Amino acid sequence: MLRAPAHGDLAVAQLWARELDEGRYYCSISTMYRILRATGEVNERRSQATHPAKVKPELVATKANMVWSWDITKLRGPDRGVYYDLYVILDIYSRYVVGWTLAPSESGELAKDLIGDCLTRQQVTRDTLSLHADRGTSMTSKPVSQLLTDLGVVRSHSRPHISNDNPYSEAAFKTLKYCPAFPDRFGSIADARLFCEQFFAYNNHEHRHSGIGLHTPASVHYGTALEIRAQRAATLDAAYATNPTRFTQRPQPPMLPTIAWINQPIEEVAQSA
């Protein structure tokens, strides 16, 4: 009786009361629980819905403008409860911030305009770019989805509650907020915008990024890093020729990136093993 399929949706007390209403008494409620406990059936007795696991995003870039990552973070305003929303889109191969904007609130329309502007300025052609984001309201909004569909941009989203599915954007925001000049609060949205202008200009054109061979994101994004690396190699060769005893081996400048990914695909792991 306790295991009858027709009773699977009923709590024990409900079943006991219904049977009693039908003139049938088998045992007390506590005895019913004891019987079920003995066979490990005290927990949920109903058939449970099964949800397929969300597919892990796997994106690979071997040059600039193949995969972009974007996200939104909040910057504190002058007063408690006042925040400004910072939208940032970056290229995962070069780490170059292709676009950003700051607004008093989050908006799918604003996100759409920013993405469209970046696609135009970077001259991205149809079916060549994947755009990765988490599952925030703006990221999954109808205006953004429709724009990407119309322009032939592949949409990619992080799995729910998996923060490391968007590592490049997370790292960029951490770098921003751990910058020594980053204030606890901004006096106004104009102050916040000025700070971001200076920060992203520095990040793109001056900061030598360890993940891209100590080159600036702009030099990797726009293809001047190869020439810069050759110049570095010539300088190191000259130093070696002048005094080779200073070195245990011939010095080489750091290598340029050849590939970047979000969740390294299995075939890439196998090839690099």
Please state what every model-predicted region is.
Residues M1-V67, I162, V220-R232:
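Basic, flexible linker segments flanking DNA-binding modules
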Residues Y96-V97:
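Hydrophobic "anchor" residues
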Residues T125-S141, R159-S163, G213-A218:
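Acidic/histidine-rich, metal-coordinating catalytic segments
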Residues T149-V153, T175-A273:
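C-terminal domain-tail junction helix/linker
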Residues P143, D150, P167-A171, T175:
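Generic alpha-helical secondary structure signal
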Residues A4, Y25, R37-L90, E109-D117, ...:
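Mobile-element integrase/transposase regions
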